[in-house]
Every structure is written in structure tokens, then in C-alpha cells.
Regions:
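HIT superfamily nucleotide-processing domains
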Residues: 1-126
């Protein structure tokens, strides 16, 4: 099986460092949805070494800054990854989603990433 992130040559890279790169997601949840992807093929964030994790943090902060400069309406972010098929991972190459959020982009954002299990999202009203 081929890996989309390893085999693709037509990616528009926004920023890169020695360990990973950032691209705009072609199936965005919100405008400017960005993916951070390691060059080394590993399935999960949990397979990264410390240098790669540090590089992720640096690129994540840099991309956050860039996004805030591009769109003054961004008022928050969701940051996350899916690890394993049962967690929703469909591309078995580690990648982190940086999803810009704007006031009013959904009716009730309460619970954020807890929404992966919709019944558990609004934990204060359970």
C-alpha cells in the first residue's frame, strides 16, 4: 500500500524544517485548516522521537502565528491527531491538524475535541 504523504510530489509546502512540513488540508474543516506532517514515515505521533516532537511544537507555533496574521477573525484553534483506525485515522502516516476557529463558526463549540464522542461533548450537562 502506498502512503499519500510519502508518495505525493504535488504538495504545496507552506513551511518546513528538518523533520516535517506544513500544508493546507485539501478537505478543510474550516478555512486555512493546516496539516503538519513528518518527513519520516511513522504511523502515529507516539512513534516520533524527541527531536521530531520538538520540531512539531516549533512548526505548530510558527503556523499559528502565520494563520493569525492571515486572518484577524481567528479566535481559537483545535489541534489534534487521530492515532489508529478506531480513533478515526484514515491515512496511516502521522499528521497533526491545526484547525483555526472563528466566533460563530458552529452553533455550540462547547466541549471542543470531546465532540469525537457526540454524547460526551457537553460534559457539564450530563
Amino acid at each position: 500500500m502506498t502512503c499519500h504523504f510519502c508518495e505525493t510530489t504535488d504538495l504545496v509546502i507552506l513551511e518546513r524544517n528538518d523533520y516535517l512540513y506544513a500544508i493546507r488540508y485539501k478537505f478543510p474543516v474550516t478555512e486555512l485548516h493546516t496539516l503538519l506532517i513528518p518527513f519520516r514515515h511513522v504511523e502515529s505521533y507516539f512513534d516520533l522521537d524527541n527531536a521530531e516532537i520538538d520540531a512539531f511544537n516549533e512548526l505548530l507555533l510558527s503556523q499559528k502565528k502565520n494563520l493569525l496574521e492571515q486572518d484577524k477573525n481567528i479566535s481559537g484553534f483545535n489541534v489534534g491527531f487521530n492515532s489508529g483506525e478506531d480513533a478515526g485515522q484514515t491515512v496511516m502516516h502521522c499528521h497533526i491538524h491545526l484547525i483555526p476557529r472563528r466566533h460563530g463558526d458552529m452553533e455550540n463549540p462547547r466541549g471542543g475535541v470531546r465532540g469525537v464522542i457526540p454524547k460526551r461533548r457537553d460534559y457539564l450537562n450530563d
